[in-house]
Amino acid sequence: MLLLLATIVAAQDKKSPARFGRVSAEDFKQTRTDLDTGASAIIMADIGSSAFDVGNEWFIQVYKRYRRIKILNKNAYDMADVEIELYREGSKEEMLQNVKAVTYNLENGKVVETKLDSKGVFTEKLDKNHIRKKFTLPNVKEGSIIEISYTVNSEFPYHLRPWAFQGQHPVLWSEYEVELPEYYEYIFISQGYNDFFIKDSENSRKTYNLRVPSQTGYGGSAVNTESVSLSPGITRHRWVMKDVAPLKPENYITTLGNHISYIEFQLATVRYPNSVAQPVMSTWPKFMDMLLKDEEYAGTLDKHNGFLTRTVEELTDGVTSLREKAQRIYYFVRDNYTCTDLSALYAKQSIKTTFTKKSGNVAEINLMLVAMLRAAGLHADPVLLSTRSHGKVYPMYPIASRFNYTVATVKIDRQDYPMDATRPYLGFGKLHVDCYNGHARLVSPEALALTFEPDSLKEMEVTGIFLGPDENGMLKGHFQQQATYFNSYSLREKVREKGEENYFKEVEKDFRSNIKLKNGKIDSLTSFSNPAVVDYDFVLDPEEENGMIYLSPMFCEAVRTNPFKSANRRYPVEMPYVPDINYTLSFQLPPGYTVEDMPKSTIVKYNDGEGIFQYLVGQQGDMLQMRSRLKLSRATYSPEEYESLRNFYEIVVKKHAEQIVLKKKS
């Protein structure tokens, strides 16, 4: 009897815990915060399924989704705004059906429901192939439970919808079920750090009675259909995650999309009865061949581009160096063209239109750059990549949606120079830090794999401050900093936006001591291939208290807070580059003062020399010398390394907060 009871309980435990419309007063007691103490909503259930069914002429895919959400406070009111994107192409489309949405509130111990009016569903056209259905659930309050259910019938049956088991709110039950006929073989691509509560599959058989065209008339229009009965084997896959904590953004991350628990599908092979298996998933060479022929990508790189000849000849007139030719063309495009979209896989306008309008998306501008380089007789190709904010590319699978960015590359004397003419402050042969996101591909018949890893970016910053007394009892100083290359890029953006004067006003404000700044200048501000150098003089009025002067020797260069806030982390630390931050202070003591206290020297190594923090202090006569160096050897660290990295930075923060104390001589 006990065994039977245990079996029943175990079976119930594996069933979905919610059904549409079955909301009781007991459900309103659900206020679990152990998964996230700051939660504003709880996803009580998120259940989806995809299955093949009978359509007008062939299979359709039926996607169903049901969600039950508890609204804890007003910060989650946006959960009541629902958007469903649908695709259409030619005569085929995805149709939204059976929309049900209800808000439940507990009033005087009774469950009161408010249903969505069918007239409250609106349609928004995004482009020629996409529309968005939108609606907002009514009467949502703090404490409400909302339910949403809908079906999407798709005439694109082979594109299975992906599923995210994790998001920005805690999820008590997330389930996805897929039924696949034996004719279609898919690759399952999953990611994340949570274990499945249930992961199983079972086989069965199902009969589909389809009507298919038996002959075609003039122009290919169907004039007759016949009935076909198919009984393929069916494999049902089911994945469930339970009690999933939200994944929240922290410092040093590319995008949460790389790390949430998620599954997607790619059709690999079609195998119909009595037919040879047909591979569907492309290979990298085939994928690149398609792009090279695609008129919306590289198909026009070497066609009908005679209009470029005159400009290219003018730019390269009298130049014999291939590198200088490439530089002149690159600078011309960078300085004269405006990017309208920094996330675009395909070109929406021709190279000629881009050339004439002097604007375009990232693909359009950099494809035009490639065409101009080729017109100059240079060996140039596009490179396809994904930016850090877009997500990772799967090296094994050529999936177009994983890419969102095109840059150019030119080969000169066996050396490759990557270029991106959409960013106004990049030097020749440089890419923006957002492009360093791992796997990339050369768009050429060879489809060569390239890698732009953050670990390959070694960025050094060197700062020096000289401080000494002036004739008015104040401290005067000189500040000089050679910024990292990518901080230089940000600096140039700020100066363009605000002007040098306002830039230095912000510097003065951020110095963390009462200073007056003067003689500010920035060297290499317009020399984009070099790091910027910031120089200024300042006067500091030291605060004296009971004959003591307290100074923070790191001033504005201190690491003031630990960038790693959480006690633990379930995804990697992904810095944009490998830092080497150097700071020196030369301090001449003001007359009549001695050093009462100063930081002690320390050297801390991280992980057997993979990082080092040096804080060295010395005094010789009335001169104090201080040096700080924070250097790492990698940009990326695993979750297992997080605690030690966090502790390492905690040492840096505490040391940088220490003060020099000067005492007035009696």
Annotate the PLM regions:
Residues F504-S666:
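A carboxyl-terminal module marker
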Residues W284-K357:
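Secondary-structure boundary elements
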Residues Q12-S282, M290-L291, I351, E364-V370, ...:
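Beta-strand-rich, non-transmembrane domain signature
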Residues M1-S16, S666:
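Bacterial Sec-dependent N-terminal signal peptides
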Residues E313-G318, T463-G464, R570-M575, V595:
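Extended, non-catalytic structural segments that build the interaction scaffolds
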Residues K64, W173, M281-P285, D294, ...:
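Alpha-helix initiation and N-capping motif
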